[in-house]
A protein has these predicted regions:
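Conserved N-terminal segment of class I S-adenosyl-L-methionine
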Residues: 1-113, 119, 138, 211-214
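Hydrophobic adenine-recognition pocket in adenosine-nucleotide-binding enzymes
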Residues: 125
Length: 221
């Protein structure tokens, strides 16, 4: 497993502070991850799991919408931070009992029963692992969920955003190869930006450039 979990809570906290605190951070991330959120909603009726959830913003939002959500991460401090974000966000909404479970788990060893979830998803996670680990992770997610959605950076990813230090920016053709090796069949692909439409619209070059992030929707062969 490549990613060094000991600094992730600290990195996330710096991002939260830059955004002005828990609530502004969550609201900002929800806007930026709308394509991912919409894809999860498209393929899930009820039960979803986020693998390598980090601050868990997508999971927090999906639970608010009424989904039964499991968010897993390997680091205790990151889970604690995600719970804090959820608590502050849920104070602002009408849903009195969002169904979200935070669990400490290694995504290389999920341990759930077959088809426990409609969708297993991750975003900005797999690029921190080796080829063999990526294949293992996708295989496990295809076992526990009917549909798997993964978001990864493309070669158009801005290196200044590589704050975590060990991102592997692979060609999309190579990601397709790894997914096939894991026994997956790609049923949909979507490019994704993190910046808002209006912000890109006023930056001509960014608006027309290829997307820096890519989403794969995967099912078993």
């Amino acid at each position: 497993m490549k990613k060094n979990s000991s600094h992730w809570a600290e990195i996330y906290q710096k991002d939260i502070d830059k955004k002005g605190g828990n609530l502004p951070y969550v609201l900002n991330k929800i806007i930026k991850k709308k394509k991912l959120i919409n894809l999860v909603r498209k393929y899930s009726n009820k039960n979803v799991i986020e693998c390598g959830s980090g601050t868990s913003v997508v999971s927090i939002y999906l639970a608010m919408l009424g989904y039964n959500v499991t968010a897993i991460d390997i680091e205790d401090d990151v889970i604690k931070l995600a719970k804090s974000l959820a608590k502050d966000y849920y104070k602002t909404i009408d849903n009195p009992n969002p169904q979200i479970i935070f669990e400490k788990k290694n995504i290389l060893d999920l341990g759930y029963e077959k088809d426990s979830f409609d969708v297993a998803f991750s975003n900005g996670v797999l690029e921190h692992f080796s080829d063999d680990e990526i294949i293992q992770i996708i295989k496990q997610q295809l076992y526990v969920a009917k549909t798997v959605i993964v978001g990864i950076p493309t070669k158009y990813f801005d290196s200044s955003e590589a704050k975590y230090g060990n991102e592997r920016v692979l060609e999309l053709s190579y990601w397709r190869y790894l997914i096939k090796k894991a026994g997956g069949s790609i049923i949909e692909e979507i490019g994704m930006d993190r910046e808002s439409f209006l912000k890109r619209l006023f930056n001509y070059k960014k608006y027309f450039r290829p997307k820096p992030y890519h989403l794969f929707v995967i099912k078993n062969n």
